[in-house]
Amino acid sequence: MIQNEINLSFKMLKYLKFIPVNVPKLYSNEKKNISECLKTNWISSEGKFVKEFENNFSKFNERKYGIAVSSGTAALEVAIKSLNLKKNSEVIIPAFSIISTALCVIKCGLKPILIDCNIFTWNVDSEEIIKKINKKTSAIILTHIYGLPVNLSNILKIAKKNKIKIIEDAAEVIGLKYKNKMCGSFGDLSTFSFYAN
């Protein structure tokens, strides 16, 4: 019976229309800038456009500094390492997030503590975070999901009181605000990504 259902599913695939996650839009300015990179031979991470992007993106997100890296995963790893968290300490992370969040925590010699999400927003449940904070907690990674900011107010107060670092993963809320302040401007560090989602 199951094999028949699988065969039927594969036959139906030809009738489904592919819907891309994102379709890039390139205008004349982008083409001109790419041409300039090729002409000047600056196609690595040190060209003028990278510095310009870092400065403009930092200002846009109400941050003093910004460093471009190759991916959101790389950004998370750099953020975690730069905080010099105590080895084997705990980092609270959302259970509903890209696997990179947990992998970066583990790779940095820390223990991920998974927190379930709020059933209405899919964001990490702030009340559950508060319950899991203990003496071993060194950081909290707050991942904003599907364009909805995490309910930050209580978490930020408790983190400050307990000297817990906050990393904001703001990949899915670029340009959005929480209480009239840019998402990605609340944490000790914030990460962003331009993955197609």
Residue ranges: model-predicted function:
Residues 23, 131, 181-183:
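Short secondary-structure boundary/capping segments
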Residues 1-43:
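N-terminal "arm"/small-domain region of PLP-dependent enzymes with the aminotransferase-like
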Residues 46-90, 104-108, 114-116, 181:
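Phosphate-binding glycine-rich loop
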Residues 81-161, 165-170, 177:
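PLP-dependent aminotransferase-like
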Residues 168-197:
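Conserved active-site segment immediately N-terminal to the catalytic lysine
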Residues 20-22, 70, 141-143, 191-195:
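Short beta-strand segments
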